Amino acid sequence: MTSLMSNENEEKDAEKVDQAIEMISAGQGPEAHKLLMEVIKNTPEKYDIKIEKYGNFFIRFWDQAEFVHYVNYGSEEKDEGDISWIPNTYPRAFYFIGFLYMQIKDFPRAVAAFEEGQRLDPGHPMFHLEKAQAYYQMGAFDKALSEYEMVKGVGLRVSEDRYAAALRGRGIVQIETGDLDSAEAVLKESLEYDPGNNIALHELGYIDHLRKGRHTGQSTMVETGDGTLRPEHKEKPKKRKHFFWKA
């Protein structure tokens, strides 16, 4: 395993990232941030997500769900030979640093962290989903929509639930910009990938209310890439709730 690591520190750094994730779950944000900052000091300039060695492929997956999706996804893009899971360390570290900045509403720094992670792991959809969320919070709806649109469909690295989340995000941004027809279309499309999703159904109901002139205003809650809810930073009257990720 050591020969597959990007540097001599990576095995220990991967363990630190896992520890930081547990800290975040336990509400220990400052402690997690400190640990993640130690990790990113060792970030290599080049970081290979897929390594071919011994006639097999070693891929840096974020979690077991990604690994299972990749192995089971039927695509001509997939490599022949055995596929093994090795730790994804530095992109994940930047992702969770960005996540912590999102929690304290420091959206510009969150975007910067996500972009650093994306530089190392450009094919991962979570960076687009979270950057879109940050731009949405800053009121940069065009940029938010553009990030969601970068998740173009289900693929080797994009599961059905993440593509559905991108479609829901597009729909929510389009509701805010008044493009109700487009929002309705993508929200309905999202249900093809995540049938019965309460978020999509809620937003479709809200579109119906808007068309009937029953409600106005923006959300009080928005949903981040990992399924947690955050209060919206803008204080405006007559707010509603909406969500991006999962029910």
Question: Where is each model-derived feature located?
Answer:
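TPR-repeat structural position
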Residues: 29-30, 107, 141, 180
